[in-house]
């Protein structure tokens, strides 16, 4: 397990990277940190804070229902996990925290924030994850922030920090610096827009062939279901945080939205789906499977919902993935503790209806974050059943490879636990380009043309949220 001293290099595996530290294979005892919380007199939204901090290193934001609601904004991390680190073990490299004399209710304090890309499946299931890499982003990005700005569910802003003696003076300076930057910002504005996100005729045709081939695999008994995806592409030269700012200004942010600026590029995840939420020994997942267009007209929206709820195809997709998620979580939970209701809940999202089921369990004693994530990664709702064989089928059939898309995005905190989304509806940004992956579950009675249209239905609200559109050639 990779472990580090807070603020102190443990050996020569440290190097300076863009103002942060990069961790290699250092092993050291993690000291106890002290929680510091200070309420701030701000009444603004996270879009204003993001615009004020636009020049800061490794700026990131989680917005929606993360850690109980509100938002968190962080920048200037203490260190960044290097390419040789174990990304799963890194999620456990957290300090013990002394909260004596501090109201810690709802606090995050700090921790690891970032993403785990889909290609990390190779480290978990030992199967090849093939396909081209159009977006030149790392397989994972995890940065340790010992301080952040937290907006709670009631709209109050807090400066939160995990203080160790070597960092006490520096963190006081950081608070004053952030006060000055945000205090001078009047209101957040929308950032630059990408060009329209295009689906080329060639990619669309390959997707149709992939869906048809997947149905043949199902008919042959190789798999029951696989999630087959494609990518749209556009031009964009701004930052990820600016793109999320646009979505926030337009009020089109789902439950598990996130943005990360890194030297290699960035991501904007407008995901509605919870992969894992762990607090103590309780763990929860919210797999989504079953989607329908939700028209603006209320009567047509109700009709669309009724059709979704009565769809045998969507019900079959959903039941299989819920069972898969129960099995994955059950690998690290106490026997008999995993529970899911018999019927899914229909949730309304921008332009869409989704069927969602909450799966819950109680982890076995001493279960680490790494063990939990490894047991469930990559998310079942974006792979298929049986999972390992579905991974192989996906690698063989999909027209483009996956990177951050369909992995997971979120945080690991010593106070707030672990929370990761499923990185769907996620834009990957690098080199002046923007890529959006979309797809859907393929089962025995899937229709290739209908599956292609469902992918575009999912893409359009994401494009609208960031001020652009979708063009299918």
Segments predicted by a language model, with ranges:
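Extended alpha-helical targeting/anchoring segments
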Residues: 2-473
